[in-house]
A protein has these predicted regions:
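A short, basic N-terminal segment
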Residues: 1-52
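Mid-core helix/loop region of P-loop NTP-binding domains shared across ATPases and GTPases
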Residues: 4-14, 36, 99-106, 114-175, ...
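The catalytic "switch" region of P-loop NTPases
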Residues: 150, 163-222
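Walker A/P-loop nucleotide-binding motif
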Residues: 49-70
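A short hydrophobic beta-strand->loop->alpha-helix junction that borders the nucleotide-binding pocket
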Residues: 87-98
């Protein structure tokens, strides 16, 4: 066994901690700071009444959507009270190839709902979800992998997904931030009266983080 292989078996606790810090660090940028501020704006402005302001954050795999969501969660942790957990910022992922009913069940489970959804259809599950979000003190929802809800060639299915999303926002009265692939925004075109697109006026794109060699950076400045 060569020395390069064995060196990873003798990593010290201090080295492990440093590796963990590097792997979990959040690297800020003007664009990411702006998106974080936009998310917070949607949350706070929506508390002033009227229709909630929602937001769509798009980016290719590895661009940093999940990391950005984790940073906002870090800034707004769950608070434990005597009779409930206060989840001001609710975070979840759309399951793969999901339909509204599956998505509602997934979100209910992530909020700690323990009752069986057997026999319940999407409208009833959505009503329960909206009520539970309000009970848990949710002020904004960050929902990742949004493309899983629209990965279909059926326009009818897309219209159904758009309608469900609008119903969830209306029943809860809470803003939603959707994270997904760039093509995810097609769902905003599948709403019959275009009101869904009006809810998601704020749309941002995250570009992949790139490291520019110092020599190239110097050339750009010269």
């Amino acid at each position: 066994m060569n020395e390069l292989y064995k060196r990873y078996d003798s990593i010290t606790e201090e080295q492990n901690q440093k590796i963990e810090q590097v792997r979990n660090c959040y690297i800020s940028s003007p664009n990411l700071d702006r998106i974080l501020a936009d998310i917070h704006r949607c949350r706070k402005i929506s508390q002033r009444g009227g229709y909630p302001d929602c937001m769509l954050v798009m980016g290719e795999p590895g661009a940093g959507k999940t990391t950005l969501r984790a940073e906002y969660l870090r800034l707004n942790p769950i608070r434990e009270e005597s009779e409930r957990s206060v989840i001001n910022v609710f975070s979840s992922d759309f399951p793969e190839q999901s339909v509204p009913r599956q998505a509602a069940i997934c979100f209910l489970q992530d909020l700690g709902h323990e009752l069986s959804p057997k026999g319940l259809l999407a409208p009833e599950l959505t009503r329960i979800l909206a009520n539970l979000m309000i009970h848990c003190g949710v002020e904004i929802s960050l929902l990742d992998e949004f493309q899983h809800l629209i990965e279909t060639e059926s326009y009818k299915v897309l219209k159904g997904a758009a309608k469900w999303l609008k119903i969830l926002i209306n029943k809860s009265g809470l803003p939603v931030v959707l994270f997904g692939m760039p093509y995810s925004k097609i769902i905003l075109e599948c709403d019959d009266d275009d009101t869904l697109a009006g809810r998601f006026m704020i749309q941002r794109t995250i570009e992949p983080f790139r490291i520019i060699p110092l020599c190239q950076h110097s050339c750009r400045l010269s």
